[in-house]
A protein has these predicted regions:
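Non-transmembrane, aqueous-exposed alpha-helical and coiled segments at domain scale
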Residues: 1-280
Length: 280
């Protein structure tokens, strides 16, 4: 059994909150630069130039990439041989979010109740997904998720007979419906399988995969490529001004499901596809 101090979790989460909001991951920056190089439309080129300049300024001045510093979405992989000492793991994560958003002067966007709408004033609670795994390490992935892209998510319970074609049609429908609202170029997370609640989590988890890393299953990797081509053929373009770069990547995560089910969920990230990871 390995012991990890709750205060170390808090410290790591606080640091990730600030870094994720101010420094875009290298893989995302590389995709944006590649899109700028390949984009023939002058307005789209200028839009991508502005996006890349914003990325540079945010990193240099350590200021947020976007005014919407998001909900703190956290994925936790807790080793079976790990003991958290000095407090609960969830409380340690929330305290890290509280400190990170306060010390980093990041906008607090969480309301305590969806209808009463009173701001919690510290961006807690974090939205945490726990997964117990083998081993003696603790992995934490933090992804600040803004509302502009989150509000464009869609979920549908397809019929098994709808098959691959039905999945493609639904994903394209979701992206077409989103239009410029999620601040393209976007990253599209697609969950397939499980049940109503699990498929949405799959779609969100797909968004934290490195953009250069396709699905390990060749069948789904090919489907990711087909969907990316189809989405970019829509012509929405950067910021919705037109162009060939509507999406930077499509990521699919799949899991077993019931013989009578074919759940599909789409979760979209804007071009500020923020996330950080730490292993303790």
């Amino acid at each position: 059994m390995r012991t990890i101090q709750a205060k170390d979790v808090t410290r790591a989460v606080a640091q990730m909150c600030i870094k994720a909001n101010c420094t875009l991951q290298d893989d995302v920056v590389s995709c944006l630069e590649c899109a700028r190089h390949e984009e023939p439309w002058p307005v789209a080129q200028a839009t991508l130039d502005t996006i890349l300049e914003n990325v540079r300024i945010a990193k240099t001045d350590n200021v947020p990439l976007c005014q919407d510093t998001g909900m703190a979405c956290v994925f936790v992989e807790l080793g079976e041989d790990v003991n958290i000492e000095g407090g609960s793991l969830r409380a340690a994560i929330d305290e890290g979010v509280r400190r990170g958003y306060t010390d980093g002067y990041l906008r607090k966007s969480m309301v305590a109740d969806p209808l009463r709408r009173e701001n919690t004033k510290d961006n807690t609670p974090a939205l945490v997904t726990f997964d117990v795994v083998s081993g003696d390490s603790l992995k934490i992935i933090l992804a600040p998720k803004g509302a502009g892209s989150e509000n464009m998510g869609m979920l549908k319970m397809l019929k098994p007979a709808d098959g691959v074609g039905g999945v493609k049609d639904f994903v394209l429908e979701a992206v077409r419906h989103a239009g410029p609202n999620p601040c393209p170029p976007i990253v599209v997370g697609v969950g397939i399988g499980g049940n109503f609640d699990h498929v949405a989590s799959l779609a969100k988890r797909a968004l934290v995969r490195p953009l250069s890393q396709p699905n390990p299953d060749p069948f789904y990797a090919a489907l990711e490529g087909e969907l990316l081509d189809a989405i970019n053929a829509l012509g929405t373009g950067p910021a919705g001004f037109g162009g060939k770069t509507t999406a930077l990547a499509v990521h699919i995560e799949q899991m077993p499901t019931h013989i009578a089910c074919l759940p599909v969920a789409v979760n979209i990230n804007c071009h500020v596809a923020r996330h950080e990871e730490v292993v303790l």
